[in-house]
Structure formats: structure tokens, C-alpha cells
């Protein structure tokens, strides 16, 4: 029987399993199922954190795995969007590099101070919402909707907004991390 406090981690792990499924669906041009997978990923990303907090089921594994699952799935989707020209290589590279950099900073800071957690800023949450919208909208493009060009334009705008917020919040995280490392070393 599944314990209630395991559900958040199960949801997180299911997002990791979505990556190979996404690639398979994408390869076979099953775009409606790709869209469903994006919605599933967004819903489970919200639910795992919500349930973990509500039922006091947060765990070290969950705190570590949740952002990794998000980054891997998001990166997988964005890279496939480059492959079929729905996304710009430089924009996607900026997003992925920032995510890796912030993850590295979090890891470095936690090595110095096990209790330190690089807090997610409000602007970073806006970035995440913009990124989800960009991905969702861009996933609509190949569904042969009569206004695909308009959808593509909106998705691209959200992706560029995401990239700008990504670079800015990444910069802010670097500044915060440098200050924290100086405090730890002194």
C-alpha cells in the first residue's frame, strides 16, 4: 500500500519517467499526447510540492529530486523544440545553462552549510510560470490549428520573456551566492 507521505516523491519520479515517453511521442509525431504530458508535468509539479507541505511529507530526496526532475523534463522538451524549429538554440541554451548554474550554486552552498537553502525568489517563480506557458503554447503549434502562426508568435514571446527572466534571476542568484559564500568563509 502506498503511504500518503510517499505520493509527492512518486509524482516527482513520474515526471522523470515522462522524459523518455516525451521523446517517443515526439519522434512519432503524437503531438496531442505530448501536450497532455506537458499538462501532466505541470500539474504534478504543483501537486508534489503542495501535498508534501500540506501533509508534512517533505523529504530530503524530494527536495533534491523535484528540481532535477523539472529541469530534465523541461530541458528535454526545449531541446526537441529546437530540433523542429519551434525554439531558438541560443535562447534554450541560456535557459538550460542558467538552470545548471543555479543547481550547482545550490549544491555548492549546501556543501558549505548543510542547512542553507538558496531560496526561490518571486521573480524566479514568474520565470517558471512563463516557461511553462511558453512550452505549453509551443506544444500547440504542430496540432494543425488554423492559427498556428499566431500561437507560435505567442509561444516565442513567452520563451523570450523566460530567457530574459532566466538570465536576470540567474545573475541575482550568483550575487546572493557570492555574498553567502563570503559570509560562510569569514
Question: Model-flagged regions — what are they?
Answer:
Residues 1-12, 50-68, 110-129, 179-186:
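Interhelical loop and helix-boundary elements at the membrane-water interface
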